[in-house]
Amino acid sequence: HLTPVEIQLAIGLCEIFANQITLGEAEVQAQLVRDAKIKALQAQINPHFFFNAINTISAILRRDQEKARELLLQLSNYFRANLIGARETEITLGQERTQVDAYLELEQTRFPQKYNITFDQQVENDVYLPPFTIQVLVENALKHAFGARKDHNNVQITIKKLGARLVIQVADNGEGIALELLPKLGKEPLTSSKGSGNALYNLNQRLIGLYDERSALQITSSNKGTKIKISLPYHIKEGADNESLNR
């Protein structure tokens, strides 16, 4: 007989797969609307992350069923956020944080002690931004910044208001970006052995599509680390839902 935790795991997996089917349908519908290009760029799910997460949860399940259940809920949060992001061109910061926090918990469980992640959020959760904005920057840092280094890998995420602008910065203490690549990042598609070489380019294209010259992507790098900064118009919406996906 299945234990309650195993039943919950099966139910959660079914929900994830159902969400993926719904996401596919949402993408088809998105092609019929004016901003189809933007939504196509943002509705990207990394299959490697999904299978790595499932493997991590399966391994944890053998020794800590409650932790496995918590991770499964976070994986469900992650994919539910992808579903919302495929339908919307802007979401609240609270919704974005739910996905980022889910991603980070799964990655830090998979690689204990490898990453030190800190958030400095100086704005409320009801500010609006494009889906996956922070997620792309954080995932880019974890995948590309540190090479084979197994510890002392620091990532600082800063979110603040500067005048009428929302400024998001992700800084790491990694190996830095090759000088010949630095002018190209975010400006043109790049191939990558890790499968995410186009992430910054696609993000920048979405920002340009939404805000034109009112958005800015800035990248600075040295052998002591990299800083990627995004600047957007700061705005909230009247009566906006101030809660995350965990409500």
Language-model features, listed with the residues they occupy:
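Short C-terminal beta-strand
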Residues: 226-235
